[in-house]
């Protein structure tokens, strides 16, 4: 498939978010080391950033070229590459904070690191989806329904980042070593995979996107984020007496469990009661893409009714 010319604003904004967050992470890594080791770390991160920038120079242009299409394949590649490198740097920052003496590290710097991740990671995901560039999503109701589903993805990303932030924000955590490693790499894996699942659902739907049919991500999110996060936070409070557990995100997970359960029940009812003619009508292209000239009526037969939007089509075009 030949891609259209890239959207320069989208390419510049995506590159700015990625390289800006990477530069701040590099500053944390360099600042955490002293003496001759600081020079070595500085050289390593500079070489890594140059290699990453060479790859980003091509992938970001491909992402900007496909942003006006219904495909998001290059967006998934860029997301995977970004999170893979970002989390490696974050792991070393976390280990440096853990090795520091109690109270030696600035708590404001730890909060600033969490704030940076909370803005850049969900923000980059929404940039890669580029809902405002989807010109084929014409109806306001369908666009807002899709925006609401993407907002749930952003909330899940914030939930995972909050679980990771509980490892480095307090000066000293009460979790054992195996629990810290399990928590970090579990969130790492979900940050890599779940947004790619959401992007693949958007890509597979094509131009005739139907948000009510995008059920793979809600199922995975319900099992891997909402259920596991509630159990993990409850175990931290009950077993390890961890007072840093976010009660707000526990409430978010409970609300998400109830909301998604209702969504699944409603979806099953709609699939069971959906009439086949209405389903076929929903899969047809919009009236604006059809031939506006009606076919000539037969010589011997009833007159052909004029073409126009049907009530069923209006009800299903959400």
Swiss-Prot record:
Gene giving rise to this polypeptide: Tmem121
Record-given protein name: Transmembrane protein 121
Described function: May play a role in MAPK signaling.
Record keywords, A-Z: Membrane, Transmembrane, Transmembrane helix
Disordered, as annotated region: 278-318
Biased composition (Pro residues): 278-309
Transmembrane segments: 10-30, 43-63, 74-94, 112-132, 174-194, 214-234
Superkingdom of this protein's organism: Eukaryota
Membrane topology of the entry: Multi-pass membrane protein
PANTHER family the UniProt entry points to: TRANSMEMBRANE PROTEIN 121
Similarity comment: family membership: Belongs to the TMEM121 family.
GO cellular component, one term: membrane
Record Pfam families: CECR6_TMEM121
Subcellular location: Membrane
